[in-house]
């Protein structure tokens, strides 16, 4: 007996291809299914064939030459029985691929199953395996070859009529489970040892009569009582000569028979009931079980599991389970390739999100489109062969998984483009504004914003279009584009507000500078009481009475000028009327704050007291023509002092309250500032200081807002001013009294009498006279040039330097000469006896010691 060499039996885990060279054991004699069937199909390159494969099973009694027939027909190497023995050879079910196919004469990928023979003594009465193997073969095979000898035709047991009856019953069982599909199969009777004495037609007729009887004998479900065997089975017949007696003819006929195993088409003109049977290709489309090759192993295992556990065989359910299993496998495989393509982008996007730095990923759109197309195409190619309902459901699941991740990437890309676009837009506008400011030629803010908005939208749409996945329902960015445009508008408005704030700040600084200068000049003018001869006798000049009028007019004119500047510049920002109104309202409030701060600065106690004193001194020390007064005892010092003091004192109540001379009331600040614009926001108001009489919540009236000095301050300021004025008056009084001390006239007569000789000597001597004349001219020129002060200082400095130099030389002389050293020694010995002696080095120019000088300073 030849054994199944290079066949993979049950329990073999070898991955060596040589183990599967001749085939694989599908089911062993113990009803165990071989899970390595997939490996064999992979090694034989059947797995990727899809539906392009065919499965044949052979039935027959034990030791009737089934394996021999298959080996000659398909070039397989199934074990055959030795001619010297009569025993079981094939145990279980074995499978091998056709080795004779050349791609032309036979169909591709023919798989042949050698089923254990029936009626064997090894199993005896146990027919359970026969029934289960028949059911398995019928559920999986397109063609069932029934191998019988010619002399067995007409017998019941010898012709395997019992097994065929089982096949018919099983087929009806399968039909009841799936009434939508007619499971049609071909029963191919190969009559062995055919000698031709009985014509093949007669044998066909006998067998068909037996088939009809068997069919009629089985119990049928309601509705199928009138059905015939031809409704579910097709039949073909072929006779083969005796292998031992006619070996050459046997080989020749098997070659002819092998040519029948190709794809064919049903011939509708043949009537099987009249004994007309096809002699063409045996593989008709309706025979195929429509199980893809890559799922056959799983399907066969599921079928056998139900059969071996005596469960009702439900092929539709098994097909759905197979489709579920294979579609899940294919989906996982497809997702692995999808992950490889997409995960790097997901990782980059996730990292950028964690870092808070949005990044537009280059090449994302192409990768997404390619990954999605490949995933759906690969899944469709592999899974579309399976159960349509399961396939469509799993395809939807795949698309859902793929689209969920791609949608997240798409949204992330749009978000990154959104955020980076907003940042770039803001930076670009800021940079353009700064560039315009540096050039100093001015810039059109609205034009800058419009240009940058166009660039930002164009860039965003480029990114979005590049990321779009055609056919994906989520791949529409119009809503995101609208949100992007909206935020660009909001950012533009914010940048415009910021720019207007900066403009307002610049205008406010300009107002502050102008008001600081002009109002400062008005306050400085208060320090001068000189007005020329036109000054009235009372000293109350109109200019002082209208001081606040001038300040208010200056303030209003300055702010109006600033408002014109602000309005002209804001027009280039494309600002709305509401924004301009808010800006002008803020400018007026800020300007009032600037004026009030300047007034408070000028009205500090020290500054105001100084201005009052200067005002008083100008009125007191200068006459009506502005000429300085030289006080004489005959002058009315008290009257002038009183008038100047009272005139200056009138400034204190004048300055204490901001009132207009024309109306004797505070300026209309509330009307001038105006009401808060309706478009003003909280942010517009939060940095504005409250104004009394304008802001109700401030709780201050306009009168209180215009009060510069309180009563206590006025009283204190009046007292201090009077004290300062009294000091000036006392000084003037002393000056007038000091002028009364004069040299007696007789002194000049005595001086003339006693110095007459010297005067005559000088006048008579030309040299003396000329020297006197030169000295007089020099003294006059020095006086006119006001050089007596510098000359005296230079003289004093020269004398001090001469004194220091003299002391130094004297010290050197005393230290270097013998006499000097003796004198120093004597001075040192006597210093303890006299505390009044001093070192010369400690004498100053007045001859005092430094100690005496320190006492004088105290």
UniProtKB/Swiss-Prot annotation:
Record membrane topology: Multi-pass membrane protein
Record's function text: Cooperates with the reticulon proteins and tubule-shaping DP1 family proteins to generate and maintain the structure of the tubular endoplasmic reticulum network. Has GTPase activity, which is required for its function in ER organization.
GO cellular component: endoplasmic reticulum; endoplasmic reticulum membrane
Protein name (database record): Protein sey1
Location(s) in or outside the cell: Endoplasmic reticulum membrane
One Gene Ontology term from the biological process aspect of the record: endoplasmic reticulum membrane fusion
PROSITE patterns: G_GB1_RHD3
Signal peptide: none
Stretches of the chain forming a coiled coil according to its record: 443-501
Ranges that cross the membrane: 743-763, 767-787
Residue intervals of the GB1/RHD3-type G domain: 50-300
Family to which the UniProt record says this protein belongs: Belongs to the TRAFAC class dynamin-like GTPase superfamily. GB1/RHD3 GTPase family. RHD3 subfamily.
Keyword terms: Coiled coil, Endoplasmic reticulum, GTP-binding, Hydrolase, Membrane, Nucleotide-binding, Transmembrane, Transmembrane helix
Topological domain spans for side Cytoplasmic: 1-742, 788-858
One Pfam family cited in the UniProt record for this chain: Sey1_3HB
Matching SUPFAM superfamilies: P-loop containing nucleoside triphosphate hydrolases (SSF52540)
Top EC class, one word: hydrolase
EC number(s) reported in the record: 3.6.5.-
Family annotation (PANTHER family): PROTEIN SEY1
Region of interest (Disordered), ranges: 669-697, 821-858
Keyword DNA repair listed: no
């Amino acid at each position: 007996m030849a054994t199944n060499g290079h066949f993979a039996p049950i329990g073999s885990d070898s991955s060596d291809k040589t183990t599967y060279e001749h085939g694989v054991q599908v089911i062993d004699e113990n009803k165990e299914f071989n899970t390595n069937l997939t490996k064999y199909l992979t090694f034989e390159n059947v797995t990727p064939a899809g539906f392009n494969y065919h499965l044949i099973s052979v039935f027959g009694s034990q030791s009737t030459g089934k394996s021999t027939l298959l080996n000659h027909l398909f070039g397989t190497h199934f074990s055959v029985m030795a001619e010297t023995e009569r025993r079981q050879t094939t145990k279980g079910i074995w499978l091998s691929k056709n080795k004779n196919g050349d791609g032309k004469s036979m169909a591709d990928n023919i798989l042949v199953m050698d089923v254990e023979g029936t009626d064997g003594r090894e199993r005896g009465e146990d027919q359970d395996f026969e029934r289960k193997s028949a059911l398995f073969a019928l559920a999986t095979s397109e063609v069932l070859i029934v191998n019988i000898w010619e002399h067995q035709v007409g017998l019941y047991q010898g012709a395997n009529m019992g097994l065929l009856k089982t096949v018919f019953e099983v087929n009806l069982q399968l039909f009841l489970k799936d009434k939508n599909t007619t499971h049609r199969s071909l029963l191919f009777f190969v009559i062995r040892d055919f000698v031709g004495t009985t014509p093949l037609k007669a044998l066909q007729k006998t067998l068909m009569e037996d088939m009809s009887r068997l069919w009629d004998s089985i119990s049928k479900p309601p509705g199928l009582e009138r059905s015939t065997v031809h409704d579910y089975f097709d039949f073909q017949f072929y006779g083969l000569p005796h292998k031992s007696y006619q070996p050459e003819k046997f080989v020749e006929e098997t070659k002819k028979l092998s040519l029948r195993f190709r794809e064919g088409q049903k011939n509708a003109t043949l009537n099987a009931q009249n004994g007309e049977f096809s002699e063409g290709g045996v593989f008709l489309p309706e025979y195929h079980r429509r199980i893809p090759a890559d799922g056959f192993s799983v399907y066969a295992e599921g079928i056998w599991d139900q059969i071996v556990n005596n469960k009702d065989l439900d092929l539709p359910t098994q097909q759905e389970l197979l489709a579920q299993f294979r579609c899940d496998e294919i989906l996982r495989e497809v997702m692995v390739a999808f992950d490889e393509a997409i995960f790097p982008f997901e990782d980059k996007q996730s990292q950028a999100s964690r870092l808070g730095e949005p990044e537009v990923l280059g090449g994302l759109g192409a990768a997404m489109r390619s990954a999605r197309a490949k995933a759906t195409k690969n899944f469709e190619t592999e899974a579309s062969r399976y159960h349509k309902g399961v396939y469509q459901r799993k395809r939807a699941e795949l698309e859902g998984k793929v689209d969920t991740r791609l949608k997240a990437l798409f949204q992330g890309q749009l978000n990154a483009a959104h955020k980076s676009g907003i940042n770039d837009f803001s930076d670009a506008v800021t940079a353009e504004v700064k560039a315009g400011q540096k050039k100093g030629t001015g810039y059109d803010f609205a034009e800058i914003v419009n240009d940058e908005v166009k660039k930002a939208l164009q860039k965003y749409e480029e990114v979005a279009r590049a990321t779009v996945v055609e056919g994906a329902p989520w791949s529409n960015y119009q809503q995101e584009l609208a949100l992007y445009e909206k935020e660009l508008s909001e950012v533009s408005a914010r940048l415009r507000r910021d720019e207007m704030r900066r403009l307002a700040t610049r205008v406010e600084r300009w107002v502050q500078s102008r008001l600081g200068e002009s109002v400062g000049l008005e306050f400085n003018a208060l320090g001068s009481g000189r007005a020329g001869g036109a000054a009235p006798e009372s000293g109350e000049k109109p200019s002082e009475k209208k001081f606040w009028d001038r300040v208010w007019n200056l303030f209003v004119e300055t702010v109006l000028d600033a408002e014109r500047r602000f309005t002209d510049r804001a027009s280039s920002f494309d600002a709305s009327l509401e924004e301009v109104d808010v800006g002008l309202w803020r400018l007026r409030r800020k300007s009032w704050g600037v004026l009030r701060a300047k007034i408070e600065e000028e009205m500090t106690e020290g500054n105001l007291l100084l201005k009052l004193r200067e005002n008083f001194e100008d009125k007191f020390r200068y006459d009506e023509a502005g000429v300085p007064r030289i006080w004489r005892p005959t002058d009315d010092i008290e009257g002038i002092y009183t008038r100047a003091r009272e005139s200056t004192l009138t400034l204190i109540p004048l300055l204490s309250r901001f009132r207009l001379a024309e109306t004797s009331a505070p300026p209309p600040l509330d009307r001038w500032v105006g009401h808060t614009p309706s478009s003003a926001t909280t942010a517009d108001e939060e940095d504005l200081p409250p104004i009394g009489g304008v802001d109700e919540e401030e709780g201050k009236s306009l009168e209180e807002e215009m009060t510069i000095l309180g009563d206590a301050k006025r009283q204190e300021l009046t007292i201090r001013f009077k004290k300062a004025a009294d000091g000036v008056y006392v000084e003037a009084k002393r000056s007038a009294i000091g002028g009364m001390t004069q040299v007696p006239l007789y002194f000049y007569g005595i001086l003339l009498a006693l110095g007459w000789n010297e005067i005559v000597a000088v006048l008579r001597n030309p040299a003396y006279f000329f020297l006197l004349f030169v000295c007089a001219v020099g003294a006059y020129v020095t006086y006119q040039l006001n050089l007596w002060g510098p000359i005296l200082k230079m003289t004093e400095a020269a004398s001090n330097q001469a004194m220091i130099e003299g002391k130094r030389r004297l010290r050197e002389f005393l230290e270097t000469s013998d006499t000097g050293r003796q004198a120093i020694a004597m001075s040192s010995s006597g210093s303890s006896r006299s505390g009044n002696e001093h070192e010369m080095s400690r004498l100053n120019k007045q001859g005092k010691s430094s100690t005496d000088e320190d006492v004088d300073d105290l």
